[in-house]
Amino acid sequence: QRQMCIRDSFYIVSLSTKSIIYKGMLSSLQLRNYYPDLTNSYFTSGLALVHSRFSTNTFPTWGLAQPFRLLAHNGEINTIRGNRGWMEARESVLSTPDLGDIKEIRPIIQPGMSDSASLDNVLEFLVMSGLSLPHAMAMLVPESFNEKNPISEDLKSFYEYHSILMEPWDGPAALLFSDGRFAGGMLDRNG
C-alpha cells in the first residue's frame, strides 16, 4: 500500500472480509442509486454505519473521505500534533508477533492525512496487533471520569495503565467504529 499511495493517486478503502465500505462524494439519499447492490433484497447486513459530513478542515479526497476502515469521526482531534509525534517516536520499539516486521508497515500514521485518518491508522494497527476493537478504542479515547461521573476501580485502573502506553486522542469528538463484528459509538472526554 505504501508504494501505491506514494503517488497520491491510489487509496485502498478496505481489504476486510467482514465489512464493506462505500465512499462517494454524494448525499446519503444518493447511495442507493450510486451503489445498486444496496437495493438488492439478497444483500443484508446486521449493522451499518453512515458518515455524511463533508470535510471542513482538509481538502476532500478519496483517502480522507469517511468512513475509514474502522472509524467514522465527527469533530476535531485537538491533540493531533502530539499524538502523531508520540506515535512516530515509539515506532522503533513496537513489536507484535501478529504483524511480523513492523519496519515493513511504518510509518503507522500515513503522512498528509487528516486527524480522523491518523486516528484510524493507529486504531487499525492496534486491532491488527491483536487488541479487540472495543479495547483499542477505550485505550485511544478514554472516557471522562470524576466525582460527578464516577467509574469502577477496575475501569479506572484500565485507563491509568493504558495512559502509560498511549496518550489520549482528545477532541471534542463523536466517534463511530466497527470491524464487521463489533459496532459502537462514543464521545471523547471533551465531546
Which positions does each model-derived feature cover?
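Short coil/turn segments at secondary-structure boundaries
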Residues: 10-17, 63, 134-141, 152-153, ...
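Conserved catalytic alpha/beta cores of large enzymes that bind or transform nucleotide phosphates
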Residues: 78, 84-160
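Phosphate-interacting basic helix/loop segments used at nucleotide- and nucleic-acid interfaces
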Residues: 153-173
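Short helix/loop capping segments that flank catalytic or ligand/cofactor-binding pockets
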Residues: 22-25, 30-34, 57-62, 66, ...
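Active-site-adjacent "gating/activation" loops or surface patches in catalytic cores
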Residues: 37-61
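Extended boundary segments
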Residues: 11-40, 171, 180-185, 189-190
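Short, small-residue-biased leader/transition segments that mark boundaries at the very start
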Residues: 2-6
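Conserved catalytic micro-motifs used in adenylation/nucleotidyl-transfer and phosphoryl/amide-
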Residues: 48, 60-77, 81, 167-190
